[in-house]
Design a protein with these regions (language model features):
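Bacterial N-terminal signal peptides that target proteins for export
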Residues: 1-9
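C-terminal segment of classical bacterial N-terminal signal peptides
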Residues: 14-23
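Extracytoplasmic small-molecule ligand-binding "clamshell" domains
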Residues: 25-104, 290, 303, 307
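Sec-exported extracytoplasmic/periplasmic mature domains
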Residues: 33-37, 71-79, 96-100, 137, ...
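Bilobed "Venus flytrap"/periplasmic-binding protein-like clamshell domains
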Residues: 37-49, 59-75, 108, 128-184
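Extended ligand-binding regions for polar small-molecule ligands
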Residues: 65-74, 137-140, 144, 149-150, ...
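Acidic, polar ligand-binding/catalytic clefts
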Residues: 68, 72, 76, 80-145, ...
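C-terminal functional modules
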Residues: 282-323
C-alpha cells in the first residue's frame, strides 16, 4: 500500500515544481458547484472505521474523510457533502446514473471496472485482502479446513468471485448464503445461519470489534486470498472532477511527508521551504491548475487532516481497530 502512496506523493511533489496551467470546467464539477455539495456513495450498513454513522448521526470514517477532503478542495468547506448509502449491487448503477458523484466505499480497483464500466479510479486509500472469519467453537485454524462450510457473502462483488475461485483451486465445496446488505450479512453470521463470513480483512476486523456479541468468540483465519486495492471511483469523462479527487488524496499524503498536519498548518504557512509554500498555496498556481482556490490543500489539511492523521483516528492506533 505505502509503495503506491510514495509513488503518488512523488508525482505530486514533481508537479509542484512545474508550471501550472488552467483547468477547463467539466460538466460534473459544474453540476456539483451549482448544487452546492458533493454526493458521495458509501456502504449501506457501514463498516466501522471506514464509513459508519456515529451517535450524533454523523458519517465518520476513513472513506468518509476522503469525501470531506474533496468537499474542502472544491468549496473550502469539508461539510458540503451528502452521503448516500448504496449496496454492492447498487453502487455502480448509482454512479453511472449520476445519483452519486463519486464512490468512497471500499470498492476494489479492477481492470474490468476501470475499463468496461466507464469509471476512473483515482488512487488507493487502503490496500486490503480478502479473508475469512469463523466462530472459535467451529475449531477451524485454516481456510483449507472449510470444505462443505456455509459461507455468508455479498453479491456483485470481487469477494463473491474470489470465494468461488479459492474453493475451486483447493478442491473444496461450499454453500453460499448470498445477502445484499452488509448489516444483514452480519446478522446472519452472528445468528449462526452461516459458518463463515468472508469479506476484506479490514471489514472482518471492524465487524468483530463493532458488531460481534462477544468479539473474543470469533477468529479471523490467517489466509489472505486476494489483493484488494480500495479507493474512490468517479465517472469517466469529466477529467476535472476526477483530477480534484485524485489530487486531494495525493495532497493528504504529501502533507504527511512534509510534516504538515491539522495542528500546525497555520504555522506552516510561514515556512520558507519552496515546496511547502506551493503545497499550501502561499506561492500560487496549483489551485488554478485544478480550477479551485489556491488554499485548497490548506483547507483539506486544516479541516480534515493529512493521510496519517485520518488513518490513525479512524483505523489506526487511535481507533478501536488499531490496524
Amino acid at each position: 500500500m505505502f509503495d503506491k502512496f510514495i509513488a503518488a506523493a512523488a508525482a505530486f511533489a514533481a508537479s509542484l515544481a512545474g508550471a501550472a496551467g488552467t483547468a477547463h470546467a467539466g460538466k460534473d464539477l459544474d453540476a456539483i458547484k451549482a448544487r452546492g455539495q458533493v454526493v458521495c456513495g458509501v456502504t449501506t450498513g457501514g463498516i466501522s472505521g471506514f464509513m459508519s454513522v456515529d451517535s450524533q448521526g454523523k458519517w465518520v470514517g476513513l472513506d468518509v474523510d476522503i469525501c470531506r477532503a474533496v468537499s474542502a478542495a472544491i468549496f473550502g468547506d469539508s461539510e458540503k457533502v451528502k452521503f448516500v448509502p448504496v449496496t454492492a449491487i447498487q453502487r455502480f448503477t448509482a454512479l453511472q446514473s449520476g445519483e452519486v458523484d463519486m464512490l468512497s466505499n471500499n470498492t476494489t480497483w479492477t481492470l474490468q471496472r476501470d475499463t468496461a464500466l466507464g469509471f476512473d479510479f483515482t488512487g488507493v486509500t487502503y490496500y486490503d485482502g480478502q479473508g475469512f472469519m469463523v466462530n472459535k467453537k467451529l475449531g477451524v485454524k485454516s481456510a483449507k479446513e472449510l470444505n462443505g462450510a456455509t459461507v455468508c457473502v455479498a453479491p456483485g462483488s470481487t469477494t463473491e468471485l474470489n470465494l468461488a475461485d479459492y474453493f475451486r483451486a483447493n478442491k473444496m465445496s461450499f454453500k453460499p448464503v448470498v445477502i445484499e446488505k452488509v448489516d444483514e450479512i452480519r446478522a446472519a453470521f452472528f445468528s449462526g445461519r452461516c459458518d463463515v463470513y468472508t469479506t476484506d480483512r479490514s471489514g472482518l476486523y471492524a465487524t468483530r470489534v463493532a458488531n460481534a456479541p462477544n468479539p473474543d468468540d470469533y477468529v479471523i483465519l490467517p489466509e489472505i486470498i486476494s489483493k484488494e486495492p480500495l479507493g474512490p471511483v468517479v465517472r469517466h469523462g469529466d477529467n476535472q472532477f476526477g483530477d480534484i479527487v485524485r489530487w486531494a488524496q495525493y495532497a493528504m499524503l504529501e502533507a504527511e511527508e512534509y510534516g504538515i498536519s491539522s495542528k500546525n498548518v497555520d504555522d506552516m504557512l510561514k515556512n520558507e521551504n519552496p515546496t511547502i509554500k506551493r503545497i499550501l498555496g502561499v506561492t500560487p498556481g496549483m489551485g488554478k491548475a485544478l480550477g479551485v482556490d489556491e488554499k485548497w490543500v490548506y483547507n483539506i489539511i486544516k479541516q480534515v487532516g493529512n493521510y496519517g492523521e485520518v488513518f490513525d483516528k479512524n483505523v489506526g492506533m487511535g481507533s478501536p481497530l488499531k490496524i
